Amino acid sequence: MLVAALLCALCCGLLAASARAGYSEDRCSWRGSGLTQEPGSVGQLTLDCTEGAIEWLYPAGALRLTLGGSDPGTRPSIVCLRPTRPFAGAQVFAERMAGNLELLLAEGQGLAGGRCMRWGPRERRALFLQATPHRDISRRVAAFQFELHEDQRAEMSPQAQGFGVDGACRPCSDAELLLTACTSDFVIHGTIHGVVHDMELQESVITVVATRVIRQTLPLFQEGSSEGRGQASVRTLLRCGVRPGPGSFLFMGWSRFGEAWLGCAPRFQEFSRVYSAALAAHLNPCEVALD
């Protein structure tokens, strides 16, 4: 029994040492291999930064990843994940209250877009990476970027939870338009100058000309250009089929990994109608300066 206990402790120590060896110097990222991990074991990782990357080669067993240090914050926070290559060999879940798990990245997910979710106050910022079983030993890599930031908003719009996931091309309802206008990182009244399609990333890049910057929390549009208008790129899924067209729109969305991602883009007159009706009925969640 003593020998078995010593062997078990030695194995656990080797697993912990192997995990520690994969950290980057600033402990913001980790790279390691499942070939050194015992089947059925769970490696423990802690990354101290709010931005970083994970690369898990030949996934085996599972990893538990704590983000932003070991202490949970007192404010809600949003975590976003994006594959850095076709995601293979594992699934990524977010830990929720009472030990529940929420799927964020599934095996086979391509490079297009990613997924975000919101942790409440005092929820531990932890991800659970679980290897998926395969009969062969071909090279598989589960690699993704992450970003974590505090969120002071009362609630998270459904459009903010996924950038490049199923439902991203669905038109926003009236209620979603109003909520997105209040919670998004940018609200821009403008026109479509052009659209470029990236076949490799399966994304469309929309060049937006701003008539008016209503709100932005990131330096997306630089006001005061020579023409008095700013241009910026906003991304969406290729399969959404965005094309250049006439008319003015209200572009609303979020900053993800330093890029602007589209949430809702109603025609400006349509949003004005929805907002005016909500204002008259005292149902507007916030004030939007359209004039």
Curated annotation (Swiss-Prot):
It comes from the Eukaryota. Its main location: secreted. GO terms for molecular function: hormone activity. It is found in: Secreted. Keywords: Developmental protein, Differentiation, Disulfide bond, Neurogenesis, Secreted, Signal. Disulfide bonds join C28-C49, C80-C116, C169-C240, C172-C264, C182-C286. Coiled coil: none annotated. GO terms for biological process: axonogenesis; glial cell differentiation; positive regulation of axonogenesis; radial glial cell differentiation. One of its GO terms (cellular component) is extracellular space. InterPro entries: Meteorin-like (IPR051998). Residues 1-21 form the signal peptide. Involved in both glial cell differentiation and axonal network formation during neurogenesis. Promotes astrocyte differentiation and transforms cerebellar astrocytes into radial glia. Also induces axonal extension in small and intermediate neurons of sensory ganglia by activating nearby satellite glia. Monomer. Belongs to the meteorin family. This is Meteorin. It comes from Rattus norvegicus.
